[in-house]
Amino acid sequence: MWFLILFLALSLGGIDAAPPVQSRIVGGFKCEKNSQPWQVAVYYHKEHICGGVLLDRNWVLTAAHCYVDECEVWLGKNQLFQEEPSAQNRLVSKSFPHPGFNMTLLTFEKLPPGADFSNDLMLLRLSKPADITDVVKPIDLPTKEPKLDSTCLVSGWGSITPTKWQKPDDLQCMFTKLLPNENCAKAYLLKVTDVMLCTIEMGEDKGPCVGDSGGPLICDGVLQGTVSIGPDPCGIPGVSAIYTNLVKFNSWIKDTMMKNA
């Protein structure tokens, strides 16, 4: 049985906030420039830790296991380590992890058998609205479940190697395919629920990794999920990755944004 890995980029501030983590895309390819204008880079103390998705000018969606006491985001970036005039930096004024996410799981070095990692999503309220431009654009939430066998695109600046953390400069993309959740239930000891999506990478030695957590899963042109958990090491051939199924959370997302506008 494969160990689970959270796609978070580092052990935060000496706090054992997550199991050993990996968050890059292994076996991906350089995304076409500005092709993912909703892609967000989440930072903690100037260090990239997670991905995210811009939902509107004031809100970013990411993974609950990316929670830290204070963070900031970069929007409109293509290259992680380069200054880009079109990129925008915003502080996060408040974080809203989903109340159903079990934060105590982040204290484990390895997730225990039967652990329920459901509800792994979090909203970030920006301190200043994003400027919508050609390279910074929000993406709509899904309105219906994705179809099985859909071809999906995942993107992020997570590690590009499975066992040694190596961040890419260029935003990485990777194609993956939606599977029945039963496939993930067979591959993992944790509980697999209907608020999760299960994917298999199209090719060997591919998959999201450390730093990709919270990044978008786009299926047939529609945002359907955010990166959650996967095998350790990343990109094990034939082993599925798990994403948060966003259509299940439309009400919570919209209510939280409205009540904290």
UniProtKB/Swiss-Prot annotation:
SMART domains: Tryp_SPc. Residues 1-18 form the signal peptide. It comes from the Eukaryota. Gene3D superfamilies: Trypsin-like serine proteases (2.40.10.10). The active site is at 65 (charge relay system), 120 (charge relay system), 213 (charge relay system). GO terms for biological process: proteolysis. Residues 25-258 form the Peptidase S1 domain. Keywords: Disulfide bond, Glycoprotein, Hydrolase, Protease, Serine protease, Signal, Zymogen. The keyword Magnesium does not apply. Residues 19-24 form a propeptide. It catalyses: Cleavage of the Leu-|-Leu bond in synthetic tetradecapeptide renin substrate, to produce angiotensin I, but not active on natural angiotensinogen. Also hydrolyzes Bz-Arg-p-nitroanilide. One of its GO terms (molecular function) is serine-type endopeptidase activity. Glycans are attached at residue 102. Pfam families: Trypsin. Disulfide bonds join 31-173, 50-66, 152-219, 184-198, 209-234. Its EC number is 3.4.21.54. Belongs to the peptidase S1 family. Kallikrein subfamily. This is Kallikrein 1-related peptidase b16. It comes from Mus musculus (Mouse).
